Amino acid sequence: EVENGELRVESSLNFLIVPNPLKALQKLAETHRDKFKIPVIGITGSNGKTIVKEWLHQLLSPDRCIVRSPRSYNSQIGVPLSVWQLSEEAELGIFEAGISEMGEMGALKRMIKPTIGILTNIGGAHQENFFSLQEKCMEKLTLFKDCDVVIYNGDNELISNCVAKSMLTAREIAWSRTDIERPLYISRVTKKEDHTVISYRYLEMDNTFCIPFIDDASIENTLNCLAACLYLMTPADQITERMARLEPIAMRLEVKEGK
């Protein structure tokens, strides 16, 4: 309620008056994040962030308490609201980071402070504020500056070149369907009528699993999830069992049938 140009507030509430509400919110999230010494997965990329996040939750939540971004909360406002959910019970955090122009990733990185980084892909989404895909990719990679490990598609020439130029100190788990020397080699991908069979080699061990999808985007998202699960030492038999039960994720712009 406003009286004489002033907002009346409840006397029982506490308020902070700050010069910049967004920066204050982000600083609070940074401070809150610093309280937790747990693995945190930071996911960025032009597409697939939410699906990878939700599938990782399906794959990993049976073994640990996970805090993750709600829906597609990956913006300058969404990320601090997501990070604020961290609690003493949390054993793993999974947060998305989305940008639309140069210079935005630094603030998201300071709030998320990921220990595990996943770059899903690089495409034309939000390209209008970037001079090139390479510039966009380099900006996204700043999220991983202090990560222990970075996961990406080693067959993507643009991403591989940008990772090499970025001088990241993190261990790399680059998966590949063509290069047997990559840390995670995808030896075979076989599409059936309603599922896909994927065989892989990791740490000189060969395994196979199925996913209930046949589209290329789902296969790519699955391989990013696979790399994260392997890094977190999820047993191969559990990966096989849980991959087969992956469920589709409702996304933005989904067409709903009217009633």
Residue ranges of model-derived segments:
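Acidic, Mg2+-coordinating active-site environments of NTP-dependent enzymes
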Residues: 5-11, 116-259
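Extracellular/luminal Protease-associated
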Residues: 1-3
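Phosphate-binding loop of NTP-binding sites
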Residues: 17, 23-170, 229-232, 258
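Short, structured beta-strand-loop surface elements
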Residues: 11-17
